[in-house]
UniProtKB/Swiss-Prot annotation:
Role, per record: NDH-1 shuttles electrons from an unknown electron donor, via FMN and iron-sulfur (Fe-S) centers, to quinones in the respiratory and/or the photosynthetic chain. The immediate electron acceptor for the enzyme in this species is believed to be plastoquinone. Couples the redox reaction to proton translocation, and thus conserves the redox energy in a proton gradient. Cyanobacterial NDH-1 also plays a role in inorganic carbon-concentration.
Chief place where the protein resides: membrane
Gene Ontology terms describing biological process: ATP synthesis coupled electron transport; photosynthesis, light reaction
Listed EC numbers: 7.1.1.-
High-level lineage: Bacteria, Bacillati, Cyanobacteriota, Cyanophyceae, Synechococcales
Pfam family, one: Oxidored_q2
Protein encoded by which gene: ndhE
Gene Ontology cellular component list: NADH dehydrogenase complex; plasma membrane-derived thylakoid membrane
Molecular-function annotations in GO: oxidoreductase activity, acting on NAD(P)H, quinone or similar compound as acceptor; quinone binding
Name the UniProt record assigns to this protein: NAD(P)H-quinone oxidoreductase subunit 4L
UniProt entry tagged with the keyword Thylakoid: yes
Length: 103
């Protein structure tokens, strides 16, 4: 049984829209990182859906999605480490307070 492409695209579009909404409206740094992860998961879903639709015997989309997941995990670890370091100095995770590069 093959998963139909439109279901993958609808789910990926919904995830992408939720991620964009969270990215735009959130002022908390941890929520922003979670929204970025949602965006990357929507991209992964598109990669796997199109890969399955175009050539089910080829696994290029799945392999590329694994690379994206690996990069996303590294990005989340570095991002959370930066947020934790800023929280220790500023006692907040509000994005408006992250003005460390200002004079």
């Amino acid at each position: 049984m093959h998963l139909q492409l439109q279901y993958c695209l609808i789910l990926a579009a919904a995830l992408f829209c939720i991620g964009i909404y969270g990215l735009i409206t959130s002022r908390n740094a941890v929520r922003v990182l979670m929204s970025i992860e949602l965006l990357l998961n929507a991209v992964n879903l598109n990669l796997m859906g199109f890969s399955n639709y175009l050539d089910p015997s080829n696994i290029r989309g799945q392999v590329f999605a694994i690379f994206v997941i690996t990069i996303a995990a590294a990005e989340a670890a570095v991002g959370l480490a930066i947020v934790l370091a800023i929280y220790r100095n500023r006692e907040t995770t509000d994005m408006e307070q992250f003005n460390l590069l200002k004079w």
